[in-house]
Design a protein with these regions (language model features):
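HhH-family (HhH-GPD) DNA N-glycosylase catalytic core used in base-excision repair
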Residues: 1-193
Length: 193
């Protein structure tokens, strides 16, 4: 879906990458601290500033809500590939949130951790579109971030002598398992997730 928009995004990102970083993401990474957030200089902060495509933000009750799903996911992938090599390791991975998308909310609903209002559930079950930046969409995504953080805390309390999980690890487990289900998820026309 949205192929034309996605091609345009890739062209814009590619042009910026070539113009500013010799076409190499590693040059972008090397150009700042090895942190996601660092007083405006962190990897996610720079990515959403320099590549507006990654600036996944919404306004809710007159306040900006930053989801940064794809920005965080990009560095989660890079970290996963390079951390074990010693070449690149993000120092503040614990500051990463869940990747607010379509699937994690389904996992949380099926597990009875969260629930929708009757009206919202009817919309989702009947396949009605949830508008991008609507209160409903922002609340679904925000609730999934909050609930996943709380679930991670709960799991870690039970793992006393084991290495603690970080939120993206739990997010992946939820996503992987529930991605294959046929339980309806919310539908939003967006390239942000």
């Amino acid at each position: 879906p949205m192929l034309k928009e996605r091609v345009e995004i890739l062209n814009v990102v590619g042009t910026k990458l070539v113009d500013s970083y010799e076409g190499d993401w590693l040059n972008f990474i090397k150009n700042g601290p090895r942190k996601l957030y660092s007083n405006g200089e962190g990897l996610v902060e720079r990515l959403v500033l320099e590549f507006p495509r990654f600036n996944d933000s919404s306004i809710y009750l007159d306040k900006e809500v930053n989801f940064y799903k794809l920005a965080q996911l990009a560095f989660w992938g890079i970290h996963g590939e390079l951390a074990h090599t010693g070449y690149f390791r993000i120092e503040d991975m614990e500051s990463m949130t869940a990747f607010a998308d379509y699937i994690v909310p389904v996992a949380l609903i099926v597990m009875k951790i969260t629930q929708y209002s009757d009206e919202l559930e009817d919309k989702i079950m009947s396949g009605k579109m949830i508008e991008r930046d609507s209160s409903e969409e922002i609340e679904i995504r925000s609730a999934s971030i909050y609930a996943t953080a709380k679930l991670t805390e709960s799991v870690n309390r039970r793992r006393k002598d084991l290495e603690s999980l970080i939120i993206p690890q739990l997010d992946y487990r939820l996503w992987k398992h529930y991605h294959a289900t046929h339980f309806p998820h919310h539908l939003t026309y967006t390239t942000m997730y």
